[in-house]
């Protein structure tokens, strides 16, 4: 489905690519940001190293599971609602992680983060496919992929700060 870019996005093309890249990098960024804080979180919650590892496993399980469905949901309900619901759910889950009083709560909220963050990756690629012709889509995907690769490099620095 090729839609006209001018009806979908009124700003410059690079701003759309930047927005889609940020949405796409949210998943890997949210993993690598909190890993440097493992020991501090474990100490604050009285958690064992195995329990802390479960927070990562729960996130990745939710992320992998919902990657199967975000595309179908975006096809059924539209790209924008799926991204917005994903961002709202991710924001609520992030607040829940920050306010967790024990490791069980943290695991639950990390699972919710994983369930929601895949929307950015899956739907951003669908948007590129929808509105750009194949030759332009390759360039936009290259820009998005650069950010996707930079996120794991920047995240530990920010998380350890």
Question: Which sequence ranges carry the predicted segments?
Answer:
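Residue-level signature of mid-helix packing/kink "hotspots" within the transmembrane helices
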Residues: 32, 60-68, 152-153
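Residue-level signature of the transmembrane alpha-helical cores
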Residues: 23, 85-89, 93, 109, ...
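Small-residue (Gly/Pro/Ala) motifs that create kinks and tight helix-helix packing interfaces
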Residues: 151-160
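Extracellular/periplasmic helix-loop-helix junction of adjacent transmembrane segments
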Residues: 37-64
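Cytosolic juxtamembrane N-terminal segment immediately preceding the first transmembrane helix
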Residues: 1-27
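Conserved MFS/SLC helix-loop-helix module at the cytosolic interface between two early adjacent transmembrane helices
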Residues: 65-104
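Cytoplasmic helix-loop-helix junction between adjacent transmembrane helices
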Residues: 111-148
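Helix-breaking motifs and short loop linkers at transmembrane-helix boundaries and internal kinks
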Residues: 46, 78, 99-105, 116, ...
């Amino acid at each position: 489905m090729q839609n006209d870019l001018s009806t979908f996005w009124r700003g410059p093309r690079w701003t759309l690519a930047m927005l889609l890249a940020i949405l796409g990098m949210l998943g890997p960024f949210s993993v690598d940001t909190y890993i440097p804080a493992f020991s501090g979180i474990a100490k604050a919650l009285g958690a064992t190293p195995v329990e802390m590892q479960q927070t990562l496993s729960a996130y990745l399980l939710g992320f992998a599971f919902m990657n199967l469905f975000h595309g179908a949901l975006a096809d059924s309900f539209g790209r924008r609602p799926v991204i917005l619901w994903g961002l709202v759910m991710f924001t609520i889950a992030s607040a829940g992680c920050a306010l967790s009083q024990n490791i069980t709560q943290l695991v639950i909220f990390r699972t919710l983060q994983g369930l929601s963050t895949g929307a950015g990756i899956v739907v951003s690629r669908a948007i590129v496919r929808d509105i750009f012709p194949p030759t332009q889509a390759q360039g936009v995907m290259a820009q998005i992929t650069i950010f996707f690769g930079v996120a794991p490099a920047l995240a530990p620095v920010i998380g350890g700060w």
